[in-house]
Amino acid sequence: LLTPGFVDSHVHVLGGGGEGGFANRTPEATMEGLTKFGVTTVVGCLGTDGIGRDMCALVAKTKGLNEQGMSAYCYTGSYQIPVRTLTDSIVKDIMMIQEIIGTGEIAISDHRSSQPTFEEFARVVADTRLGGVLSGKAGIVNVHLGDSPRCLDLIERVVDETEIPASQILPTHINRNEMLFGKSIEYALKGGAVDFTGNEDIDYWETICDEVRVCNGIKRMLDAGVNPDRMTISSDGQGSLPMYSSDGEFLGMGVGQSSCLLKEVKECVFKTEIPLEIAISTITSNPADILHLKGKGKVE
């Protein structure tokens, strides 16, 4: 069976973590660690820590992966607003830095976010779109969704109250909990793209952490009438994953891995009987099309 190389659209290529202190920082992604799991295209991002890791280092890491043969891109910014850019301008970063295709991962509905106002968030999306228009890139804002009951409120307001289309925003971690997932179905039915976060230990995150299992979530979206082209799966690779027992006891710190992509696709096919062509598109053609990655995600 021949498939395109996988597109992992959300990877902390510089490493993630740090939320428990400096000793909790996770290692960088490596060429071998990506390709051995079938990933040939990667989009790097910064997360909670936009200080100890910055845009100079992220762009340099992205360039290095490209020199090794990976098709590597990145977002400008991190969780925070105002966005910490390379050139002091979102528009300029996207226009003038070849590897930068959008902004992210901007955090909302999360205690670790900057608690941005609607106006602040809308301006980030608008500037990102303009940068994309002027450079021929996607101009996507990759949005981290947390546990707050506000869910996708800011995203929905941008789509409803401005002229900016839903195609400029890609919310991720939509399977974090049942409430957020339900809201994400509604958003996707309006045409928005959504990104599931895959897991290496699928049973743990479903049973202990109450996440929506990716294969079940995709099946539910398909049954609800969501366009299959609007769904993607990413790994949150190299991100820190605190592990707890059912009693809440801390068991240790895991690290996100791109290996979860193929595991999740297999579950879609064998557990929920989703057609292979739909399942595999979530890590190939769908992210490539949504992010305007030309020549990626398909075998032609």
Task: Describe each model-derived feature in a short phrase.
Residues 46-184:
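Histidine/acidic-residue-rich, glycine-tolerant segments that coordinate divalent metal ions
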